[in-house]
Swiss-Prot record:
Subunit structure: Part of the 30S ribosomal subunit. Contacts proteins S9 and S11.
Biological process according to GO: translation
Alphabetized PROSITE patterns for the sequence: RIBOSOMAL_S7
Gene name, Swiss-Prot/TrEMBL: rpsG
Similarity-based family: Belongs to the universal ribosomal protein uS7 family.
Keyword flag Hydrolase: no
Organism: Flavobacterium johnsoniae (strain ATCC 17061 / DSM 2064 / JCM 8514 / BCRC 14874 / CCUG 350202 / NBRC 14942 / NCIMB 11054 / UW101)
Protein's UniProt name: Small ribosomal subunit protein uS7
SUPFAM superfamilies: Ribosomal protein S7 (SSF47973)
Role description: One of the primary rRNA binding proteins, it binds directly to 16S rRNA where it nucleates assembly of the head domain of the 30S subunit. Is located at the subunit interface close to the decoding center, probably blocks exit of the E-site tRNA.
Origin superkingdom: Bacteria
Protein backbone atom coordinates (compact mmCIF):
# COMPACT_ATOMS: atom_id res chain seq x y z
CA UNK A 1 0.00 0.00 0.00
CA UNK A 2 0.94 3.63 -0.46
CA UNK A 3 2.47 5.50 2.43
CA UNK A 4 0.50 8.63 1.57
CA UNK A 5 -2.06 9.76 -0.96
CA UNK A 6 -0.74 10.42 -4.45
CA UNK A 7 -0.53 14.09 -5.45
CA UNK A 8 -3.12 15.38 -7.89
CA UNK A 9 -1.46 16.29 -11.16
CA UNK A 10 -2.59 19.64 -12.58
CA UNK A 11 -4.60 19.39 -15.81
CA UNK A 12 -4.23 21.96 -18.57
CA UNK A 13 -7.52 23.52 -19.71
CA UNK A 14 -8.71 22.63 -23.22
CA UNK A 15 -7.94 25.04 -26.09
CA UNK A 16 -11.52 25.84 -27.20
CA UNK A 17 -13.46 26.34 -23.94
CA UNK A 18 -10.52 26.87 -21.56
CA UNK A 19 -12.08 24.32 -19.17
CA UNK A 20 -10.23 21.66 -17.14
CA UNK A 21 -13.37 19.50 -16.92
CA UNK A 22 -13.36 19.15 -20.72
CA UNK A 23 -9.72 17.99 -20.67
CA UNK A 24 -10.56 15.44 -17.98
CA UNK A 25 -13.47 14.16 -20.09
CA UNK A 26 -11.29 13.94 -23.20
CA UNK A 27 -8.66 11.99 -21.24
CA UNK A 28 -11.35 9.42 -20.39
CA UNK A 29 -12.58 9.40 -24.00
CA UNK A 30 -9.07 8.84 -25.41
CA UNK A 31 -7.97 5.43 -26.70
CA UNK A 32 -4.34 4.36 -27.31
CA UNK A 33 -2.97 7.79 -26.35
CA UNK A 34 -4.67 9.50 -29.30
CA UNK A 35 -5.62 12.72 -27.56
CA UNK A 36 -6.03 14.87 -30.69
CA UNK A 37 -8.53 12.33 -32.07
CA UNK A 38 -10.40 12.35 -28.75
CA UNK A 39 -10.53 16.18 -28.80
CA UNK A 40 -11.87 16.07 -32.37
CA UNK A 41 -14.59 13.59 -31.36
CA UNK A 42 -15.56 15.74 -28.35
CA UNK A 43 -15.64 19.03 -30.29
CA UNK A 44 -17.63 17.40 -33.12
CA UNK A 45 -20.11 16.11 -30.53
CA UNK A 46 -20.42 19.63 -29.07
CA UNK A 47 -21.07 21.00 -32.58
CA UNK A 48 -23.75 18.33 -33.17
CA UNK A 49 -25.38 19.27 -29.83
CA UNK A 50 -25.33 22.91 -31.02
CA UNK A 51 -27.31 21.98 -34.16
CA UNK A 52 -29.72 19.55 -32.44
CA UNK A 53 -30.61 21.56 -29.32
CA UNK A 54 -34.13 22.97 -29.04
CA UNK A 55 -33.75 25.90 -26.64
CA UNK A 56 -31.44 28.83 -27.41
CA UNK A 57 -30.80 30.00 -23.83
CA UNK A 58 -28.17 27.29 -23.12
CA UNK A 59 -24.87 26.77 -24.91
CA UNK A 60 -23.87 23.29 -26.04
CA UNK A 61 -21.15 23.19 -23.33
CA UNK A 62 -23.81 23.97 -20.67
CA UNK A 63 -25.97 21.14 -22.06
CA UNK A 64 -22.96 18.78 -21.78
CA UNK A 65 -22.36 19.93 -18.19
CA UNK A 66 -26.07 19.41 -17.37
CA UNK A 67 -25.81 15.90 -18.83
CA UNK A 68 -22.77 15.22 -16.63
CA UNK A 69 -24.62 16.52 -13.54
CA UNK A 70 -27.66 14.34 -14.32
CA UNK A 71 -25.49 11.22 -14.64
CA UNK A 72 -23.52 11.93 -11.43
CA UNK A 73 -24.32 9.40 -8.65
CA UNK A 74 -24.51 10.52 -5.01
CA UNK A 75 -24.34 7.13 -3.28
CA UNK A 76 -22.91 3.75 -4.26
CA UNK A 77 -22.80 0.29 -2.70
CA UNK A 78 -19.55 -1.30 -1.61
CA UNK A 79 -19.06 -4.93 -0.62
CA UNK A 80 -17.98 -5.72 2.93
CA UNK A 81 -17.57 -9.11 4.57
CA UNK A 82 -19.10 -9.34 8.03
CA UNK A 83 -19.01 -12.72 9.78
CA UNK A 84 -18.93 -14.89 6.67
CA UNK A 85 -21.60 -12.92 4.82
CA UNK A 86 -20.95 -10.26 2.19
CA UNK A 87 -23.12 -7.15 2.50
CA UNK A 88 -23.64 -4.39 -0.03
CA UNK A 89 -23.16 -1.25 2.05
CA UNK A 90 -24.37 2.14 0.76
CA UNK A 91 -21.67 4.83 0.93
CA UNK A 92 -21.46 8.52 0.07
CA UNK A 93 -19.21 9.25 -2.91
CA UNK A 94 -16.37 11.80 -2.88
CA UNK A 95 -16.96 14.77 -5.24
CA UNK A 96 -14.03 13.92 -7.56
CA UNK A 97 -15.18 10.28 -7.79
CA UNK A 98 -18.74 11.43 -8.63
CA UNK A 99 -17.37 13.35 -11.61
CA UNK A 100 -15.16 10.46 -12.80
CA UNK A 101 -18.01 7.95 -12.56
CA UNK A 102 -20.35 10.27 -14.46
CA UNK A 103 -17.78 10.78 -17.22
CA UNK A 104 -17.01 7.07 -17.53
CA UNK A 105 -20.69 6.11 -17.65
CA UNK A 106 -21.52 8.81 -20.21
CA UNK A 107 -18.68 7.59 -22.46
CA UNK A 108 -19.47 3.88 -21.92
CA UNK A 109 -23.16 4.23 -22.81
CA UNK A 110 -22.36 6.56 -25.72
CA UNK A 111 -20.05 3.85 -27.13
CA UNK A 112 -22.87 1.30 -26.85
CA UNK A 113 -25.28 3.39 -28.94
CA UNK A 114 -25.71 2.55 -32.62
CA UNK A 115 -25.25 5.84 -34.48
CA UNK A 116 -22.63 6.13 -37.24
CA UNK A 117 -19.78 8.03 -35.56
CA UNK A 118 -18.62 8.33 -31.95
CA UNK A 119 -19.28 12.09 -32.07
CA UNK A 120 -22.94 11.43 -32.98
CA UNK A 121 -23.26 8.79 -30.26
CA UNK A 122 -21.75 11.09 -27.64
CA UNK A 123 -23.97 14.00 -28.72
CA UNK A 124 -27.11 11.82 -28.57
CA UNK A 125 -26.23 10.43 -25.13
CA UNK A 126 -25.48 13.94 -23.81
CA UNK A 127 -28.76 15.33 -25.15
CA UNK A 128 -30.64 12.37 -23.64
CA UNK A 129 -28.85 12.73 -20.29
CA UNK A 130 -29.55 16.48 -20.22
CA UNK A 131 -33.27 15.58 -20.44
CA UNK A 132 -32.85 12.96 -17.66
CA UNK A 133 -33.22 10.12 -20.18
CA UNK A 134 -30.81 7.60 -21.70
CA UNK A 135 -28.81 4.62 -20.50
CA UNK A 136 -26.28 6.61 -18.43
CA UNK A 137 -29.04 8.21 -16.34
CA UNK A 138 -30.67 4.78 -15.95
CA UNK A 139 -27.34 3.48 -14.57
CA UNK A 140 -27.34 6.28 -11.97
CA UNK A 141 -30.95 5.49 -11.03
CA UNK A 142 -30.09 1.78 -10.67
CA UNK A 143 -27.11 2.62 -8.46
CA UNK A 144 -29.32 4.80 -6.24
CA UNK A 145 -32.01 2.09 -6.11
CA UNK A 146 -29.42 -0.48 -5.04
CA UNK A 147 -28.21 1.85 -2.27
CA UNK A 148 -31.79 2.47 -1.13
CA UNK A 149 -32.54 -1.27 -1.06
CA UNK A 150 -29.47 -1.91 1.14
CA UNK A 151 -30.04 1.04 3.48
CA UNK A 152 -30.52 -1.41 6.36
CA UNK A 153 -26.80 -2.29 6.21
CA UNK A 154 -25.57 1.31 6.36
CA UNK A 155 -24.55 0.86 10.03
CA UNK A 156 -21.74 -1.47 8.78
CA UNK A 157 -19.92 1.52 7.24
CA UNK A 158 -16.15 1.35 7.00
Amino acid sequence: MRKRAAKKRPLLPDPRFNDQLVTRFVNNLMWDGKKSTAFKVFYDAIDIIETKKQNDEKTSLEIWKDALTNVMPHVEVRSRRVGGATFQIPMQIRPDRKISMAMKWLILYARRRNEKSMAQRLASECLAAAKEEGAAVKKRMDTHKMAEANKAFSHFRF
